[in-house]
Amino acid sequence: MTLTRKTLFLLTAAFGIHSFQTASADAVVRAEKLHASANRSYKVAGKRYTPKNQVAEFTQTGNASWYGGRFHGRKTSGGERYDMNAFTAAHKTLPIPSYVRVTNTKNGKSVIVRVNDRGPFHGNRIIDVSKAAAQKLGFVNQGTAHVKIEQIVPGQSAPVAENKDIFIDLKSFGTEHEAQAYLNQAAQNLASSASNPNLSVEKRRYEYVVKMGPFASQERAAEAEAQARGMVRAVLTAG
């Protein structure tokens, strides 16, 4: 059964279940001819890089950053104009153009981007994503995030994102101290439940929210809500 927002509202009269998978569409994966010059060996700051000459399975973990304003409209290594509002990325050696799924390992959010540029060449960063991609991954304000990247081969199924973006909002508070106190009490109440979910405090614009999760699916989140009902007092928050 598909759980619509209305159905979830009825299921969670006290809790708010929300997902972050409703953001703008990712890059659409398609087979493309590799760019000749953008995939040649090159040197930056005395170090030589040799790009991959074919799209194949590849995974990598490390730090990601994003680039925006002052690069917007400039030419990329693939000869296109950089658009910070599109779902694109820069990588030192992945084929241009190619597609990867980028997953923020801290919050589980993911996005599919099209690699059309080279970089980043700063510190230990492995990928530069567009501002739009960084917004979807949830690290625009932080500037960097630890990520996992997975090469997508056209014609094959895209790697499935680990579903770590479904949470139940328990209650919101005006101060972090109040939220932490509530979290501690809720953790004690939920310790004996079958799901025994993780609890955390998230700072939002004007409040601190105690949330439970992540869960692998909306169905699993609804089950956890049913187990937790009566153990803690919750409020519905719009997702």
Curated annotation (Swiss-Prot):
Query: What is this enzyme's EC?
Result: 4.2.2.-
Q: Which PROSITE patterns match?
A: SPOR
Identify the stretch annotated as signal peptide in this record.
1-25
Q: Which UniProt keywords apply?
A: Cell wall biogenesis/degradation, Lyase, Signal
| Taxonomy, superkingdom | Bacteria
* Gene Ontology biological process terms from the UniProt entry: cell wall organization; peptidoglycan metabolic process
* Enzyme class per UniProt: lyase
> Cross-referenced InterPro entries, in alphabetical order?
RlpA, RlpA-like_DPBB, RlpA-like_sf, RplA, SPOR-like_dom
- Which residues are in the SPOR domain? 160-239
User: A Gene Ontology molecular-function term?
Assistant: peptidoglycan binding
Enumerate the CDD domains for this protein: DPBB_RlpA-like (cd22268)
Quote the Gene3D superfamilies the UniProt record gives. Answer: RlpA-like domain
What function does this protein fulfil?
Answer: Lytic transglycosylase with a strong preference for naked glycan strands that lack stem peptides.
What the record says about family reads: Belongs to the RlpA family.
Q: What is this protein called?
A: Endolytic peptidoglycan transglycosylase RlpA
Q: Which organism is it from?
A: Neisseria meningitidis serogroup A / serotype 4A (strain DSM 15465 / Z2491)
Q: Which gene specifies this protein's sequence?
A: rlpA
